[in-house]
Amino acid sequence: MVTFYLWRMSAAAIISNWKKKEFKPVYWLEGDEDYFIDEIVEYAEKKILSASEAEFNQTIFYGKDANWTDIVNACRRYPMFAERQVVLLKEAQQMKDVEKLESYIENPLPSTILVVSYKGKTLDGRLKFSKTIKKKGEVFLSKKMYESQLPGWVNEYLQSNGFQIKPKALHLLIEHIGNDLSRIVNEIDKLSINIGSEKNITEDHIEKFIGISKEYNILNCKML
């Protein structure tokens, strides 16, 4: 099994555990692939709590503007009319003193779920801060996918949404977009709307709805 699927399963495993109401007090999401981090954060924001629970028990901070004391104070609050609360720290890589959260992470409140998004960077595993997070919570490393792994991932994503894609169309899509997973998903989602009830994606669909010229496609095919 290639490394990519291990990464993907790690993201899926976190969400799967949440669906089973199995939570750790801290989740640290880091690395240079935004897609999987965003996937986890979106679930945490929209699915862990019901709408009525989130009204009183969900707090969102953004690293650029966040003060570590405010985050700690929010984490130390007890939930209202719910079993737990969710505290999200997005774009934590923009927070200058994020390591000061260690004082809370060393002794987290069991009823609080702190989810930290630390995009484009990774912590130095030798630091005490990093070791504390690993001891008290869970660290998810999201890496950029290798080019050789993209076809399998795109096929898996399409099949999970009820679509098939012809090999040349798949190559054309990846060649044009590259390994930006968020953009690939956005283009596929847009494509699925435009092709209506059709379930087999062809080169014509890619050319028409993703904006790839026929000249580019002809040149690309000659290079195969």
Where are these regions (language model features)?
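Conserved beta/loop motifs at nucleotide-recognition and modification sites
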Residues: 2-224
